[in-house]
Amino acid sequence: MKYIIANFKMNATQELINHFLNNLTLFDEQKIIIGLAPGDLYLKTFVNLAEIKKVNLYAQNPSLHNKGPYTGQISCLQLLDINIKNALVGHSEIRIDFSQSIIDQKIKISMDLLEQVIICVGETFDAYKQNKSLNFVLNQLANIINYKGLKKIIIAYEPIWAIGTDLELDFKHINYMIEGIKTYLYNCTGINIPILYGGSVNDNNINELCNQKLIDGFLIGNASLDVNVFNKIIDKCK
């Protein structure tokens, strides 16, 4: 099974999402799972069309609270109220503003209430240069092994220094990191948790990425905004 998840970040419009969903290439649901994080504003609008198109919708940043005086936040209970059952949690662009403790609380409540949670992890450029990448990422995962709902999670490994850049991918490093994460999680939980790769995934490098057998799928940012490019990525993963 391959997971191919589009993260529109804060780039979506109704027109863009509608065009994306209505122009997706055909795919085998038994082999590929397609997901879209369009921006929480648009989740309710497109929940029915996404279901018809067999696309899983994801919230981008659920609150650590269920309800209360938290202006501007969206809780997991509110997501469930509009039939949204999945979320991304801990993306590097979110981690800039929140401590690891807050991210862990977001992860825990999402795992408690939602059906699927994609937990984003990734090291800084300094950690990469100092050969501390794996320790950096495992520290981000240290607490989740004690949470309930581990079979609900997917890990998206996105080296921070590779997101939104044209840097050449270091495939040796990617394999080292994904193998290290998989081994750590299996040793701690006994569960084979899927690991996705994110970080400047596009139609130019997808061939080589698909050849990396440890990768269970992809979290795709900018390249997903063009449905034709996204379709090429799907086709390569078939």
UniProtKB/Swiss-Prot annotation:
InterPro entries to which the protein is assigned, alphabetical: Aldolase_TIM (IPR013785), TIM_sf (IPR035990), TrioseP_Isoase_bac/euk (IPR022896), Triosephosphate_isomerase (IPR000652)
EC number of this enzyme: 5.3.1.1
Sequence positions that bind substrate: 7-9, 164, 200
Catalysed reaction equations from the record: D-glyceraldehyde 3-phosphate = dihydroxyacetone phosphate
GO-annotated biological processes: gluconeogenesis; glyceraldehyde-3-phosphate biosynthetic process; glycerol catabolic process; glycolytic process
Taxonomy, superkingdom: Bacteria
Ranges annotated as spanning the membrane: none
GO molecular function: triose-phosphate isomerase activity
Pathway membership: Carbohydrate biosynthesis; gluconeogenesis; Carbohydrate degradation; glycolysis; D-glyceraldehyde 3-phosphate from glycerone phosphate: step 1/1
Localization per record: Cytoplasm
Keywords linked to the UniProt accession: Cytoplasm, Gluconeogenesis, Glycolysis, Isomerase
One Pfam family cited in the UniProt record for this chain: TIM
Residues the record marks as active site: 91, 158
Cellular component per GO, a single term: cytosol
Record-linked Gene3D superfamilies: Aldolase class I
Oligomer and partners: Homodimer.
Family, as annotated: Belongs to the triosephosphate isomerase family.
Biological role stated in the UniProt entry: Involved in the gluconeogenesis. Catalyzes stereospecifically the conversion of dihydroxyacetone phosphate (DHAP) to D-glyceraldehyde-3-phosphate (G3P).
This protein's name: Triosephosphate isomerase
Biological classification of the source: Bacteria, Bacillati, Mycoplasmatota, Mycoplasmoidales, Mycoplasmoidaceae
Gene name per UniProt: tpiA
